[in-house]
């Protein structure tokens, strides 16, 4: 069931994105498997363009309080896109037991890994003392899935 939840949430992201940013572009990069388990040649799930910003977005869903970085198999590929002006690289994460949708910039994940952390925890969200940037995506639960408003992503700065 969890895999079905994840795939349906991933498929819902473009609809919410287009509702949030009318006239924007969001393109799904279909998985091109390399032949090895859980590997893909594509750097992310979606490439989106809105209001002069390019977004490289990996979409993940996870049960529980934490999202282990070991589940982010695209980390190395995504990392090669860090540092470009007006390009936002990160993960849209749905912790479905908490009805929480968040955006975690890849630079935050990079810093967490450098600090020895192995995962993103729900306690980091909305925590003023958390030194890592994690952005709550305003969302409303509709039966199972969340309707998300991605407009908060316009406030991201270079490096987020």
Which ranges hold each PLM region?
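Acidic-basic catalytic patches of nuclease active cores, encompassing PD-(D/E)XK
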Residues: 1-37, 160
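Short, conserved beta-strand edge motifs with alternating hydrophobic and charged residues
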Residues: 29, 56-59, 92
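Active-site-adjacent loop/helix micro-motif of nuclease/hydrolase catalytic cores
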Residues: 38, 63-75
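Beta-rich catalytic cores
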Residues: 42
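Conserved catalytic cores of phosphodiester-cleaving nucleases, focusing on short active-site segments
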Residues: 46-48, 52-63
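Nucleic-acid nuclease catalytic cores
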Residues: 82-111
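Short, electropositive alpha-helical surface patch
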Residues: 107-125
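Charged phosphate-binding loop/patch that engages nucleotide di/tri-phosphates or the phosphate backbone
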Residues: 125-160
């Amino acid at each position: 069931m969890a895999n079905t939840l994840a795939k349906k949430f991933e498929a819902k992201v473009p609809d919410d994105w287009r509702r949030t940013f009318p006239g924007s572009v969001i393109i799904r990069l279909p998985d091109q498997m390399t032949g090895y388990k859980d590997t893909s040649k594509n750097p992310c799930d979606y490439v989106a363009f809105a209001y002069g910003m390019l977004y490289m977005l990996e979409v993940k869903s996870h049960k529980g309080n934490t999202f282990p970085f070991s589940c982010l198999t695209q980390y190395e590929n995504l990392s090669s896109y860090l540092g470009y002006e007006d390009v936002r690289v990160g993960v849209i994460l749905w912790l479905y037991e908490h009805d929480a949708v968040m955006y975690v910039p890849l630079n935050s994940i990079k810093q967490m890994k450098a600090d020895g952390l192995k995962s993103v925890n729900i306690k980091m969200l909305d925590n003023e003392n958390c030194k890592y940037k994690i952005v709550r995506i305003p969302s409303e639960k509709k039966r199972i899935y969340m309707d998300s408003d991605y407009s908060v992503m316009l406030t991201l700065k270079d490096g987020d």
